[in-house]
Structure formats: C-alpha cells, structure tokens
Amino acid sequence: MKPKLMYQELKVPVEEPAGELPLNEIEAWKAAEKKARWVLLVLILAVVGFGALMTQLFLWEYGDLHLFGPNQRPAPCYDPCEAVLVESIPEGLEFPNATTSNPSTSQAWLGLLAGAHSSLDIASFYWTLTNNDTHTQEPSAQQGEEVLQQLQALAPRGVKVRIAVSKPNGPLADLQSLLQSGAQVRMVDMQKLTHGVLHTKFWVVDQTHFYLGSANMDWRSLTQVKELGVVMYNCSCLARDLTKIFEAYWFLGQAGSSIPSTWPRSFDTRYNQETPMEICLNGTPALAYLASAPPPLCPSGRTPDLKALLNVVDSARSFIYIAVMNYLPTMEFSHPRRFWPAIDDGLRRAAYERGVKVRLLISCWGHSDPSMRSFLLSLAALHDNHTHSDIQVKLFVVPTDESQARIPYARVNHNKYMVTERASYIGTSNWSGSYFTETAGTSLLVTQNGHGGLRSQLEAVFLRDWESPYSHDLDTSANSVGNACRLL
C-alpha cells in the first residue's frame, strides 16, 4: 500500500531581464572571441605538427623496432646509397670494343678493408686466398694474398672481424691465420641442418657498406674466374638488414645449434617483396630488398630467394636477361633424381604468354654437367616465329691457354644475376633446385627506372658479354671453341 503523499507545486524562479550591453562592447566581445578561436586553431595545428615531426624522427632513429603490421609500408631510408658494379675479369679475357668497364673485385675489397673502422662480417663458402691453399705457384694469386694480409691487420687495429663459413672439408690455413690475428670464426654445418652448404658470399663493413656477389674467398675469384657483384656504399639501412642474415648464420654456427621453428624477433625484417625499402640509389629513387635461401633460414618478413627470383621473372614485360654458371630444372644433388621446373616454367610462360624476350647466358667449362645441354636445347626450341616466342641460349666460354688450364677449378664465368626492363637481381646461387631449397644463399633485388642506375649498368654488362666472341650458340662446333667445354 502506497503511503499518502502531499504534493506541492514548485514555483519556477522568474529570471529578471538582464540589462542590455552597449553596442560597442558587443562588437569588442565578438572580435575577442574570433581572435581566441584563431589562437586555439594555431595551437592545435602546432601540437599536431610537432607530434608528426617527433614520430618521424623516432622512426628514423628506431627503424628496427616492430612498429608495422605485415602490410604497412616502413619508413623510407634517407641514406645517400651508392651502388657500384664490380667484376673479376680473368687474365687474357678482353673486351676491346666494349664501352662498359667496372672496378675490379679485388680493388673493391681492398677499398672496403682500408675503410673499415669498427666491424667486418663475412659470410663465405670456403677460403683459398693463397698459392699454398691450391698447391700452385701462380703469380696471379698475389691479389688474393694481399686481401688476406689486409684482413689479418684488421683485428689488431680494433676492427671486430666475424667470419661465418660453411663447415669445410678443404684447406683451413687462411681461417687459422685469421683466428690467430684476432678474428672470430664460426663454421656452419649446413649439411646437418638442411643437407646443403653455406654458399653465400657477402661482406658487411661497419654496418654501412657491403659487397654481395658471386666471388668466393679464393684468389682465383680475383684473377682467373669471371665474377660479378655489387658494392653498396653509405647504405646503412640495407647493410643493417644484411647483417640480420649474417646473424642467422652466426647463430647457426654455435655448437649444437639447430634451425628454430620460429626465429626470434630480432632476426625479423620489415623489408621484402611486399614492402621493399625506399632508397635513393645513385641519386635516383629505387626500391630494394634482400632475399635469402633456403626457406627455413627466412625469419618473419624475409622473402625466400626463389620467390623473389620468380617475381622478377613474372613481372617482366619486355625482356629477361640471365647470366648464371649452372642452369638445371632439377634437384641437382638429390637421389633419386627429381625434376624441378619452377624457374623453367616461369621463363617459358613469360616468353609464350607475354611475348617477353628471354636470353640465357650459361657457362661452359670442364666441370659443366652434361645434362644441362638437353634442358637448354629444350628452352631454345621455343624460339619460334609462329608462336612469337623469343628464347635464345648461348654458352660463355673463357679462353684458356696451356698454363692456365693447369689451374684447378678456374677459367669459368661464375656470374649469378638477372636483369629485366624493371629490375635487377644479383645473387649467390646457381639456378637449380637444391640451391633454393637446401643451400644457403642471398640476393639483392632493386627496382629502378631511368638510365645510369644499377639496372641499366647490369643490362650493359649482359649485352657486352652476349655480343662478345666468347659467347657461342648451342650448335657451335666444339673444335672451334678450343676449351674443355662439355656442353658442345
């Protein structure tokens, strides 16, 4: 039962009329209000602008922090990166009419060593920089021996030297001498880890400059084998990212190590095929990233080498020029034999479906796998005016005299690169399945428009070699070559 309540009507207080302000005071009040609004707007814009500036500065300073999702583009690199192609041209190999000339590999290496201040990291396959290593007495070994001497001088002058090398089954004298000089060396047992080898070839100096290319730590790679690589100067953004690949090798070089099921985040990268690094390269805007093989050695964000290579092939619309020592659409070292057409299919599709001009310059020497010839002939057979498929294959043979023929494992074109109208790919692997699925390798990919950049320089090198007298059609007589080419 509700209690009986007494309600009393409340009286709303009546507002007394306010006195009206004089007209001049009203105008003054409106002007002051307008001014206050403008001041507030300026303050808000200043705060927002300052916040944006500090955010940008933070990203520049702490670019390696994990601040981006998988599809967010990282901040550009503002280093004045300079790329220089470097080559080893074997003694006796001349291009008299060529307009393309690049610094030598030994010149570039010695320059990097002379300029090293704090650190040098080297990822390598094997070490034979002296005549003693190869049981030879060749004057041309002098360049390799000088490189070794300069390497030995680094640690005593305060440079931290780290060397990751494939677990060797050959000479150790160079590595032992470097250990004695104060360098650190770790041997990576890729055979145990992935049934492959550490085939990578790169240097990182002061986390600012780097070399990446086909040259091994071998005196023959400086004077008796044709090599190609790139030196990147003043490009700490890319150099630090390459150091992450080295750190993976360094980690795996520890005793009892194994490949992590998930790599620690410190190995991750933000730069890959989907989000390449924006850089200024030789004064021109470019996109770049580093890829790695095999896939188990690719932490989060790292594009596998094969995926990167195939993306270059699939993106080409005009031409694809390839220079590589070995080309085999097989798992070269597998037993039983396995067909592996990943790259082969991409090249055939590019030529047939998109009308892309494909050129392959394959090396031929005394150690070439004879089975390559059948696969190369199969590719070349697609050259047809009716289908408008334009694939051509040539063999590059380094001329050899009697004394040079006595140098073991020399006198070969060891290049491993590709160039299209859009991109350049410089790697460390031969083009067969095992190199991408089991063996450790690294590649640099750069997309750059215009002339004078890395891409156009690489194209010029390819055309120089393609049009040289050292390049031969597959139907060339073996007798006319005068070398131990096993593919003719």
Curated annotation (Swiss-Prot):
InterPro entries named in the record: Diverse_PLD-related (IPR050874), PLDc_3 (IPR032803), PLipase_D/transphosphatidylase (IPR001736)
Annotated residues for binding of Mg(2+): F436
Segments on the Lumenal face: 60-488
Keyword Hydrolase: yes
Effect annotated for changing E421A: Loss of protein stability
Post-translational modification: N-glycosylated.
Single Gene Ontology BP annotation: regulation of cytokine production involved in inflammatory response
Listed name of the protein: 5'-3' exonuclease PLD3
Annotated organism of origin: Mus musculus (Mouse)
Name of the gene: Pld3
